[in-house]
Amino acid sequence: MKKNNTILYYGCAAQARYASSNHGLLYSPSQAHLFNFSLARTYLNFSNGFRAFSSERKRQNSWKLSVRSIYMDSVNFTKHDFINALLKNFKQGNVYTVLVKVEYLDSSGNRAWCMLNVQKGIIYRNKSDFIELVKEFFDEVYIGYIEYMSRYHAQEVLSIQIMYILNNDSYRQYSLKNINKEKLDKNLVNVKQTKLDFSESLLPLTTNEKFYGKRLTPILDYKKQFVTSLYINGINFIKLVNKKSKDLNQEFINFDSKTRFYRYKLNEIEYIITVSNISKTETVKTIYLMTGFKFKDNILDKELTTKIFSRQIGNTTIEFDGADIINKEIKLKLPIIRLNYKPFTDLNSRIGTFDLETFRDYNSNSAVYALGFSTLSMSKTDKKTSMYYLTKDGNTSHEIIIKCINEMLSSDYRDHIYFTHNLGGYDIIFILHALKLENKIILENKLKGINTIVEDDKKIKVKKKKPISDVNKKSQNKDHYEISTILRDDRILKCVIKVKTPSGYNKITFIDSYNILPDKLDNLAKSFGTEIQKGLFPYEFVKSNTLNYVGITPSIEYYKINNEVISQELYNELIVPQWDLRKQTLHYLERDLLSLLEIINTYNHYVYKRYNVQLTESLTIARLALNIYLKRYLGDNLIPVVLNNSLFTSIKAAYYGGVAEVYRPYGKNLRYYDVNSLYPFVAKNTMPGHECKYIESKKGLKLSELFGFFYCKVTTNNQYLGLLPVHNQGLIMPNGQWYGWYFSEELKFAEVNGYNIEVIKGYQFNKIDNLFSSYVDDLYKIKANSEGSEKLITKFLLNSLLGRFGMSIFKLKTDIVSVEKAKKLAVTNYINSVKAISDTDVLISYNKEISRKLVEEHGLNYIEILNSNSKLDLEKNNSFKDVAVSISAAVTAYARIFMAQTKLDILKNGGNLYYTDTDSIVTDIDLPDNLVGSELGQFKLEFKLKEGFFISAKTYCLILEKEYIKKNKNKDTVIKAKGVFKTSLDVEKFKSLYFNKQDVEAIKSNNKTNYLEGYVNIESGIVKLKHDAYTKRSKIYDNNGLWIDTKPLNYQVSNMLEDTNSKPLNSPNNNDLCALIKYNKPCFDLIKYNKSITDLILYLPTNKAKFINYAQLESMINEAIHESDMRVANHIKMLIYSLTGILYHGKDGTMYIYSPNSKKIYIKYKKNNKWVTFWNIKYHNGYVYIKNKNKFYLYKG
């Protein structure tokens, strides 16, 4: 572990050492494969990026100097190391903003990054308080880490980046003078008011009116129908009431003759309680102050039995048995998704395409050597495209990019939307870097008196002026190219570029076409049947010294498809007598531009003509599908927008994805089945509506009467298939006992199949039938009866709608800001993504709402911060109004039910299961005829297999029967392995993985993106595929030690996994246990307890450390959730996951404590009423070893 100015390396750096080599990083041979391609490259890239900050280069507004980073790996990401890392880098007396970013491999095996939503302000006053704050922060970080990695289906975590900013000066003038402790964050639920409403101080908790005080006798009118007067101390109370009503513009109140009045006194304050009967068992009550002011009205009491009654105040109803609360119900008013209908009278035809080509420069970084664009109007002329080449049109990549952008911004091509395939992952990095560099050059010229103007004749004119004075520098400091972007998940979806001209502003917009057509360009061209198809090009042939190459055609080794060299037959078609790189590049570039343009134009016309929807108004295929659904299919249906934070958090906890499991790792004569449009099919089931109420009962809720999302205790019946998912570093389907949130219909399915479900609380919804039936049926019919582009478009629309409802409710704002502005935002707003694009500019995506919690954590005054942002509109829409997580959670649950029922039927019919993914099953028997076919929701037989190897989720090899080889492009195998090149694997390697239990090597591609320097390098490297990577089920071995089957993991409420039928505990080669220990990191090492979780005693590491049992802990969690304080609830939950000590009582009262940080167990007992450490012991393979006189003895106590 070594500090290098701004970066610390933890974890795997235990094997890594710094030396005076080029990169300063060495690693042991046993770790070489790890460092070769994953962590080492990550560390080295950042090391190079942050390496040298000599004093002459330091600038106060440099982002590189403002943001420091600490890197940790996942295996050693512990609370202990986290605290030490911050202690080593943070200085007492400072204020810091801390963010956490994770680098991981996604479900396709590609490197990706995400910012955890755990941003925190930390004031370092003294060491002890600081450590407590950091402990609490780690708990928040770890929960976010687990949730995000599960949400993004991460296959492997490569590194955790702790980013911190010294923020002593940001908003210093608004700092609070006395802050001695952290304040808890509360959701927007009026907990205090609800407590007050239902307290004895408001109204006695009984329906017996003798406890309401002295009954008063009113005066009635002559017909004895209404009360005219009620004199109290000589004053007519009825007149006071109606005078107050008139003053407050409320209705005149008539009390009928049956109204009863009581004078009630509490804490020296007097009230008047009125009681009116609605029925024999129901009364409504109103409470007035003696001034006539209506303090609380419409209190509805209902007698349920002689002892039990319910009281409703506002939207809350509570049932009481004496003074005990036995049931709660809170009605929630949910907004609904509304259609903002805007009919279009004409198709937006101002569209174009953009693309660029790169090569490796002398620094081995990618640089642009050709680029161009086309528009619909241009494509109809002889010119067709406008393209630039490095050696012909400019001397540098920067120069030709700026020339191209300037032409696009000219009067002929302005106001166009330019589609670029993979804009966010590639092209935009080069564009942004060039524009920011050009802005800097133009500003420097302005200060020298040289002004740059873009004229309508497309030329740039330079006018000499007097140098700008210091007084005018600020007003002249505006960027020449004004840039705005929209980010999502660390990728740019849209980029708008504007320049000021004498006649106003010229603007162009870049949109990533991959997000609305998620497939490779060559595949799209074939499906759309474009006139111009994407060609083949020898990318690796292009180098600095070949840019002007003219000669023979490059050799066949340079022409590849998916990293595989093309056939000789195909290569022969590419040979030409004189091969000119510039001409070939521009020809290839033009084909790409025109091919994509034709695809977009066809797409644009199709959705406009069929649905009257503009393609250009959608940045993603999911948004386009939603626009079509809302416009054509929503009708009178009411879909709720879940904006309430507690409700959103609870339903999000019940939102699980698809299940990918290996059951048997190897088999012969198998069938591979896929479901036809699984999610659209199950979306035709009954869906949650917009009427919602929170319900909770001390006696438990009856599952058969429920529909919605509920928190429950689950106890399984230990069968071969797990039926309910659990988030635990991915999705597992275990046996055991735990608590969790689930969709009611999935709970009913589990209960029918033997699970014991105790429902504790949750959200009851009304039911909507046929919400998506018309949409699904129409699009599936079109898909089934069409081909080419229409079939592909319909497929995308059909499969993309439902996931859109599961988006986060919070809108993000994306800006390019100065470093100082970014630092201020880090103090007040939660950051989603941040990238340095120059020394002084930051591309930042953040939640628009100023966070009171974050502000106060930094020791600032929230109200004064709001006042300092005078243009801020607190009521401005900061949330999406068209997302409904309840829909997405229900759809995915219905899909799991459907797949689980099919798997149970296979087992019931004598079949075996080998592998399953979200919508596919591999088995050794034929499915019944009624389940197989081409209809929606039926299975299709994708392949018959001679053999199948299933090593892990999404890592398998299928050897096909002869009649299915042609269907597979004349290949006899189907290989899949987490994003690696399929050509780097073969059957023999899978045999080594399975039969020989040997790891194998494969090749995968990674993108190294550098916004600051403006390049993206696509690199290939060797990775290891682990033979024992699968840990989502417990493995079963034959007598020869060969893995032959699996069973569910055993999962307990404390998140401790226990393999109850593993090999003998004293076996040194306990593979199951080792796998589970590895699986459960970085949470804690596995400890096996013979006792029930309810017998555990937990050590609570607070300022006043104490021991509590599990029931007390559950009570604390529930109380925090009831009080809508999720921060406290999550913090307590983390004590189960990674607390300082876990312990339980022995027979003699001795406590056994396990410390994950020290990796030791301590036995403590009371001696003179003090807890003391008696023996130092170790834990191995299920046994405790006691250290005595430097030797360890087996402990059997």
UniProtKB/Swiss-Prot annotation:
- Protein location: Mitochondrion
| Alphabetized InterPro entries for the sequence | DNA-dir_DNA_pol_B, DNA-dir_DNA_pol_B_CS, DNA-dir_DNA_pol_B_mt/vir, DNA-dir_DNA_pol_B_mt_lin_plsmd, DNA/RNA_pol_sf, DNA_pol_palm_dom_sf, RNaseH-like_sf, RNaseH_sf
- Gene Ontology MF terms in the entry: DNA binding; DNA-directed DNA polymerase activity; nucleotide binding
Taxonomically, which superkingdom? Eukaryota
Q: Which PROSITE patterns match?
A: DNA_POLYMERASE_B
Catalytic reaction annotation: DNA(n) + a 2'-deoxyribonucleoside 5'-triphosphate = DNA(n+1) + diphosphate
The catalytic activity of this protein is classed by the Enzyme Commission as 2.7.7.7
CC terms in the record's Gene Ontology section: mitochondrion
Record keywords: DNA replication, DNA-binding, DNA-directed DNA polymerase, Mitochondrion, Nucleotidyltransferase, Plasmid, Transferase
SUPFAM superfamilies cross-referenced by the UniProt entry: DNA/RNA polymerases, Ribonuclease H-like
Q: Which GO terms describe its biological process?
A: DNA replication
Q: What else is known?
A: This DNA polymerase requires a protein as a primer.
> Which protein family is it in?
Belongs to the DNA polymerase type-B family.
* Name of the protein in its database record: Probable DNA polymerase
From what organism does this protein derive? Answer: Podospora anserina
Its lineage reads: Eukaryota, Fungi, Dikarya, Ascomycota, Pezizomycotina
